Structure formats: C-alpha cells, structure tokens
C-alpha cells in the first residue's frame, strides 16, 4: 500500500475513483526506474534529489507513489540498500552520546577522537558512521529493474488498496477462483458475509473503518485480499468509503483489468490453531475434515474451517478471525435461522467488543474442547443407552448417575468400584492400569479420571503417577 498522503483520487457527486496510471505515464515510470538504475553505489538521498526533479504540481503524488512501489519491490525482490560504514552506527551513537552535549568544536573533536581510539579507527570514520543507517545515507547496492508497464500496474494495485483502506464495507462478485478467494478471506481473518443476489454469490467484507481498534492490522489484511479478487476472469467491486466524515461509493469491474498486475499475494498464515483443533478432535474420536466446501443455506452461505462427521450427518465448525459484537451476533442469528449445523468459535483477543454473544464459543489461549463437544452433541440425536460403561458420544447430556472418564460415561457405583480396584493394585506401569480398565471396557483416555497420569520415560515405556 501507499502512505495516505500519496492517495490520489477524484471525488465527485458522492463517488470516489482512484487516479490510476496508464500508458500516458509510461515515460514518467521509465524515468523513475532509470534513476534507480543509475543510482547503483549512490546514497538514497541522492536518488531522491534526482526524483524530485521529475515532480510538478500535477504529478508529485504519482512520482512519489512510483518510488514507494519501487522501494517496496526492492525490499521484497530485486534490490538492496546497505549501510556505508565499517562500524555499527547504533553503537557509535551510544558511545558518542554517553559523553553528553558538546558546546564547542573543540569538545566535539575531543569526543570524536576518544570514540575513534575505542574503535581503533579515525575520527572521520566515526563521523561518517554516526548516521550511516539513516534512510538518506543508505547505499543502493543491488537493483534488478522492473519494466515501466509492471511498475505502473503495481502502482495501480497499491493505489486501489490504499483507497480501500478506509472502506466501511466491500461488496464483490467473482466469476471463478472462488476456493482461492474464500480461503484467503479465512486466512486473513476477515469479517465476511456470503449471500445470493440474482443468481450470483456475492461477498460482503467488513472494512477497517468500522473498527475501533486494530484498524491498521485489519486494514493491511483487508488490502491483501484485493489481488485475489483481481485474478478472477470477471469481477465487480463496490465499496463504501469513509473519507473526511463523508461517505463515498467506489465501483470498478474487470473492464479495467489490464491496469493491474496478475500477482498472487503471499499470505503469512499460522495454521497452528487449526492443526491443533483437528488433532485434538481426532484424539477424542471424531472424524474431522479440514476446509470443506462453502455451505449454502437459503440465500446465505458460510465458509467453515472444519466438518465433523457424526454418522450420516455433518456438523460444521467455523473459527472466526477479527470480529465485533455485531458481526458475531448477526452471524449467530443467521446460523440459527438457516438451521445449518454450524458451531461458531471466536478468539477473544481478535475482538473489537465486549464478547457477550450467545451461541458463540469464546476462548483466549486454548479452545475449550469440552464446550465444543457439548455443542456437537446438540446436533446428534440421543440414543436410549443403558449400561455401566457407555461412550460419551452416545449422550447429548450425561445423566447425573454417570461419571465422565475420558471418552466414557461410567455409572457412579461402577466408577467407585474400578477406583478401589486400581488403588488396591497400586499400578506402576501403563500396562498394569490398562489391564484393569480393559476388564470394564475402558480405554487409556479414562486414566486421569481415576487420579493418575501417564509419564513416558522412553520409547514405548511409560509409568503411572498419581495426579495429586
């Protein structure tokens, strides 16, 4: 994206439209690239002096925008700026400033000589090193140029992303690449709504301007979605943008697709939470499917993260990214009214609200799997079960005469009987306690319920310890 001061748009009659670069700006883009080409081995400050010569009252935002895009491209891909100093500037400054404020040239020279002796160098080298890491002092050491056409297209993408940073909401339609787009929405943690309009699946994404906190973080994630939309064969974007306390509408479609690059936005995505969820649920005996297809219900649709198979029925689970109270409340209402078997989970520290929403499982550090299982059971028809030991999945709610032991519900008197037998036998190995549990139809998951835990002391060897 570009800094807000480089936002270059046209506003008229409640509409806003970015002033995209085109073939008329080819020569300007070429000149900016040429400055970087000829700037190898020179200071960044010198490059900027040359670039300012290209500026006038009409094009200064575009010139500076081209430079910013070129710099971003440099940092990511094609060039490098290095410090022109054999000393580390930060250490030099720390040592110089330890001597306090100097009031004369004589004092200044004395401090420089002292620091030079410390680093075994000359005062001139110390003076050069003092601010060698400032932006204007950095040296351009490598540059693989873009073509003017690519620079123009990358600039247009950055300008569009910057225009949309203050969006209240973004509504779009794409003809294809739906799975890529929806996966991006989820991985970026964006607040969204899917609905049908005239046979088309429309997507409405909440903009950063609606949030009271985390605006910058959400806005950057929001911007990263745009390239995924633009890669579709056909697309349409409509945005409501807040600008200087006024609301503007921006509408663009694939008729201007040639103004943008065909780039795939790299997403840094931490899948640890999803991997842990799948692993834990599988350990609890559930069959879990990751990233199932979009689930439609009436005119609405949802992008679940998981599908849990309960016999011949699927229950969907969605872990929300960023959220507000209103967003979660509306989503929960739609789930309820559509009768979709979907469980909504939200992380407290990603929220912009009081987190007081019914029918949403909230968590801070770890997902409360007990609540998830309880919610899953609401979707499973309860069987009439009898027996001393019953698998938990057969109960929607465990009767009071049973005690939960891992994946099992054990009749209370039988539970006490097993507990006494374990205490009398005083097990020391995993095999000792497993033998007792097996007699009653219980597995390893029940061990903790009886006051013991497993400690592995080697490959394939474990001992039993009391938990208290």
Swiss-Prot record:
Gene Ontology terms: biological process: DNA repair
InterPro entries cross-referenced by the UniProt entry: Bax1 (IPR008508)
Cofactor: a divalent metal cation
Signal peptide location: none
EC class name: hydrolase
The UniProt record lists the keyword DNA repair: yes
Region annotation (Central domain (CRD)) ranges: 168-260
Gene: bax1
EC annotation from Swiss-Prot or TrEMBL: 3.1.-.-
Gene3D superfamilies cross-referenced by the UniProt entry: 3.40.91.30
Domain notes for this protein: Has 4 structural domains; the N-terminus (residues 1-146, NTD) interacts with XPB and has one nuclease activity, the central domain (residues 168-260, CRD), the nuclease domain (residues 270-372, NUS) has the other nuclease activity, and the C-terminal domain (residues 400-468, CTD).
Protein's UniProt name: Endonuclease Bax1
Chain residue ranges for the region called C-terminal domain (CTD): 400-468
Alphabetized GO MF terms: DNA binding; endonuclease activity
Disulfide bonds: none
């Amino acid at each position: 994206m570009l800094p807000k001061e480089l936002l270059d748009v046209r506003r008229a009659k409640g509409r806003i439209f970015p002033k995209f670069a085109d073939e008329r700006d080819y020569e300007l883009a070429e000149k900016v690239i040429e400055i970087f080409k000829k700037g190898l081995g020179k200071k960044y400050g010198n490059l900027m002096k040359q670039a300012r010569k290209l500026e006038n009252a009409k094009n200064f935002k575009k010139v500076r925008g081209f430079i910013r895009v070129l710099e971003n491209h440099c940092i990511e891909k094609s060039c490098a700026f290095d410090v022109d100093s054999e000393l580390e500037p930060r250490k030099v400054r720390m040592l110089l400033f330890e001597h306090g404020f100097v009031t004369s040239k004589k004092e200044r020279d004395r401090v420089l000589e002292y620091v030079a002796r410390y680093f075994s160098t000359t005062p001139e080298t110390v003076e050069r090193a003092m601010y060698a890491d400032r932006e204007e002092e950095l040296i351009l050491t490598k540059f693989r140029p873009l073509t003017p056409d690519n620079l123009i297209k990358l600039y247009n993408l950055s300008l569009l992303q910057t225009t949309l940073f203050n969006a209240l909401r973004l509504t779009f339609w794409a003809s294809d690449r739906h799975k890529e787009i929806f996966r991006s929405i989820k991985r970026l943690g964006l607040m969204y709504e899917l609905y049908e309009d005239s046979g088309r699946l429309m997507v409405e994404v909440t903009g950063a301007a609606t949030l009271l906190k985390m605006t910058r973080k959400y806005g950057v994630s929001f911007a990263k979605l745009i390239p995924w939309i633009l890669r579709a064969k056909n697309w349409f974007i409509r945005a409501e943008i807040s600008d200087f306390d006024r609301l503007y509408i921006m509408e663009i479609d694939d008729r201007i697709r040639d103004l943008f690059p065909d780039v795939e936005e790299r997403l840094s995505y931490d899948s640890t939470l999803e991997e842990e969820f799948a692993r834990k649920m599988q350990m609890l005996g559930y069959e879990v499917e990751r990233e199932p297809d979009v689930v439609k219900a009436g005119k609405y649709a949802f992008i679940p993260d998981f599908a849990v198979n309960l016999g011949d029925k699927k229950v969907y689970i969605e872990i929300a990214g960023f959220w507000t109270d209103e967003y979660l409340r509306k989503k929960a209402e739609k789930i309820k009214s559509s009768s979709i078997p979907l469980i909504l989970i939200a992380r407290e520290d990603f929220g912009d609200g009081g987190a007081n929403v019914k029918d949403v499982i909230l968590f801070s550090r770890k997902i409360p799997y007990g609540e998830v299982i309880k919610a899953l059971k609401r979707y499973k028809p309860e069987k009439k079960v009898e027996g001393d030991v019953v698998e938990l999945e057969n109960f929607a709610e465990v009767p009071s005469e049973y005690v939960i032991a891992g994946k099992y519900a054990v009749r209370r008197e039988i539970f006490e009987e097993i507990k006494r037998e374990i205490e009398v036998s005083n097990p020391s190995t995993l095999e000792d306690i497993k033998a007792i549990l097996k007699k009653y139809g219980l597995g390893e998951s029940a061990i903790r319920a009886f006051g013991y835990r497993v400690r592995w002391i080697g490959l394939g060897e474990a001992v039993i310890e009391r938990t208290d």
